[in-house]
Amino acid sequence: MNKQVLLKNLRTIPDFPIKGILFFDVTTLFKDAECLKIMVDELYEYYKDKGITKVVGIESRGFVLGGALAEKLGAGLIMARKPGKLPAEVVEETYEKEYGKDTIQIHKDALNENDVVLLHDDLLATGGTMAAAERLVEKFGVKKTYVNFIMEITDLNGRNVFPKETDVYSLLSVSEKQ
């Protein structure tokens, strides 16, 4: 099974960034051509009939597969960035983090009410960043929004921050208790 290939190639680093945390390093999946192809193909199969017009990649690892997936779906790519990184007028959403606030932005002309949007990032942990990205995209009055991750850490219950009607899909589900 393809997901087993991904799990086999996923690097875990104990006690990073602090003691007691098991860090899942997706960069090992990006560097392997077979894994990269599996991820793009699996995501394409899931979303190919959903009418996606724009893929929004979340800074920065969401850009990696976001671009490849957008091309395969025949959709445009929008980059959701931290403040000060986009040159034109932006729309933003500020959200709470464990130790303060953060903000995510996209260009004001990036989306419209006719778009069907796929939000993509590498990892679902607590869900705060992606929930903010979803609220940001909703400000444009888009037709539909889908949320996707390469990997979900199930112990952290991040999917619970999304409204029940949000379609949340993760290629891989992992546990910090492995």
Question: Which residue stretches match the model-derived regions?
Answer:
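PRPP-dependent phosphoribosyltransferase catalytic core
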Residues: K8, A131-Q178
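Short, glycine/charge-rich flexible loops or terminal/linker lids adjacent to PRPP-binding catalytic cores
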Residues: I78-V117
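Conserved G/P- and acidic residue-centered "switch" motifs that form tight phosphate/ATP-binding loops
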Residues: D122, G127
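Short, hinge-like loop/turn segments at secondary-structure boundaries
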Residues: L73-G74, T94-E98, P163-T166
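Active-site-facing substrate-recognition patch
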Residues: M1-I52
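Conserved PRPP/pyrophosphate-binding segment of the phosphoribosyltransferase/PRPP-pathway fold
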Residues: D41-T94
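Structural motif
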Residues: T53-K54, V116-L118
